[in-house]
């Protein structure tokens, strides 16, 4: 592969770094976003993701960009994303067909909205519950970058778990990680900026017996392209911000605004969820996903898909002032409309 294109400008870094025989599985950014919406909407219930549900979510995401499908087609890796984007649950099972014992993304999602009979009644949320992680969340999100990068920017609800922690001789895993390791209906998701660190950490953990582990495909770089707002708190690093398209005129930079540090934020606000849903609509298109959660959202049907995907403004059809019934009405989701 050449180092630079014909015009001599440096060649952009690839968004995905697929390798053959990857030990870990991958979860698409769009699938992760769907899982986030479900978990946030049903946060007052015991959540469990099943492989079948993830498969359905991934299938509903099958209309994602052709570029992603082309990349997946070129890889023989075990963790390559499927051309179909089922539900988050589908995604997990579809990539590892022979592993019946491991917790798949599908298994995690299919149980969303159902009470865990063994655990009895649903836990009542304390007044300060919004400052805490979602109870019984079906996924554990780990940021494997260094602590400074985490404090500058991270996905809402992620825990800081620098990759160097894996090198510890004693106690390399927190209690949360041990609780989620290979637990039924639970998965662990690792991410970084561009898959460099996350792929190493995921490989190491899989070699140490983690069977329900996933890597966020494309990392923050792809996440920033598809979801410029909503999923992240803080200021994205320059390496994750989308470059100008070839031939476009670069505007003279204005005064540089100071980068805002990440908040100690564990839950998504209603505004965050609205933005995530709108970017999902822009990426997939409501007509291509009749089984998606927002199929009955009248505002979503009026959505206008912007020309550019990365770094775009919020789609013009996105509701900004009124409540989104799909996001905030947990009763609607309890019926599992994605089935």
UniProtKB/Swiss-Prot annotation:
PROSITE patterns membership: RHODANESE_3
UniProt keyword Transcription, yes or no: no
Positions where Omega-N-methylarginine occurs in the chain: 309
Domain of life, source organism: Eukaryota
Pfam families registered for this protein in UniProt: Rhodanese (PF00581)
In-chain residues carrying the UniProt-annotated modification Phosphoserine: 62, 65, 80, 87
Spans annotated as Disordered: 56-99, 283-339
Domain named Rhodanese: residues: 135-232
SUPFAM superfamilies from the UniProt entry: Rhodanese/Cell cycle control phosphatase
Subcellular location(s) of the protein: Cytoplasm, Cytoskeleton, Microtubule organizing center, Centrosome; Cell projection, Cilium; Cytoplasm, Cytoskeleton, Cilium basal body
CC per GO annotation: centriole; centrosome; ciliary basal body; cilium; cytoplasm
InterPro entries, sorted: CEP41, Rhodanese-like_dom, Rhodanese-like_dom_sf
Keywords in alphabetical order: Cell projection, Ciliopathy, Cilium, Cilium biogenesis/degradation, Cytoplasm, Cytoskeleton, Methylation, Phosphoprotein, Protein transport, Transport
Main subcellular localisation: cytoplasm
Main function: Required during ciliogenesis for tubulin glutamylation in cilium. Probably acts by participating in the transport of TTLL6, a tubulin polyglutamylase, between the basal body and the cilium.
UniProt similarity note: Belongs to the CEP41 family.
Subunit structure: Found in a complex with TTLL6.
PANTHER family (UniProt xref): CENTROSOMAL PROTEIN OF 41 KDA
Protein name: Centrosomal protein of 41 kDa
Protein's gene: Cep41
């Amino acid at each position: 592969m050449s180092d630079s294109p014909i015009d001599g400008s440096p060649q952009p870094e690839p968004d995905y770094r697929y390798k053959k025989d990857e030990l870990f599985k991958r979860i698409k950014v769009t699938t992760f976003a769907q899982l986030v919406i479900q978990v946030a909407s049903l946060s007052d219930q015991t959540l469990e993701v099943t492989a079948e549900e993830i498969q359905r979510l991934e299938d509903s995401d099958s209309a994602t960009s052709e570029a992603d499908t082309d990349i997946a087609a070129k890889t023989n890796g075990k963790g390559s994303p499927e051309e179909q984007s089922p539900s988050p649950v589908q995604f997990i099972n579809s990539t590892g067909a022979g592993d019946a014992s491991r917790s798949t993304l599908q298994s995690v999602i299919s149980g969303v909205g159902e009470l865990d009979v063994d655990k009895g009644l649903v836990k009542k949320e304390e007044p300060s519950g919004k400052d805490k992680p979602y109870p019984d969340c079906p996924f554990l999100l780990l940021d494997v970058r260094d602590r400074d990068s985490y404090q500058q920017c991270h996905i809402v609800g992620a825990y800081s778990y620098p990759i160097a922690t894996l090198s510890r001789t004693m106690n390399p895993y927190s209690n949360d990680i041990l609780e989620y390791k290979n637990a039924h209906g639970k998965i662990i998701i690792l991410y970084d900026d561009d898959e460099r660190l996350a792929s190493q950490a995921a490989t190491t953990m899989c070699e140490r017996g983690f069977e329900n582990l996933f890597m966020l495909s494309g990392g923050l770089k792809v996440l920033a392209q598809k979801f410029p707002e909503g999923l992240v708190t803080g200021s994205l690093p320059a390496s994750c911000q989308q470059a100008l398209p070839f031939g476009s005129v670069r505007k003279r930079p204005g005064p540089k605004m100071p980068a805002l540090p990440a908040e100690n934020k564990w839950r998504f606000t209603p505004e965050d969820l609205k933005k995530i849903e709108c970017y999902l609509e822009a990426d997939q298109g409501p007509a291509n996903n009749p089984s998606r959660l927002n199929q009955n959202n009248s505002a979503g049907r009026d959505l206008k898909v912007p020309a550019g995907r990365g770094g775009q403004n919020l789609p013009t059809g996105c509701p900004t002032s009124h409540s989104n019934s799909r996001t905030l009405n947990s009763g609607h989701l309890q019926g599992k409309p994605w089935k």
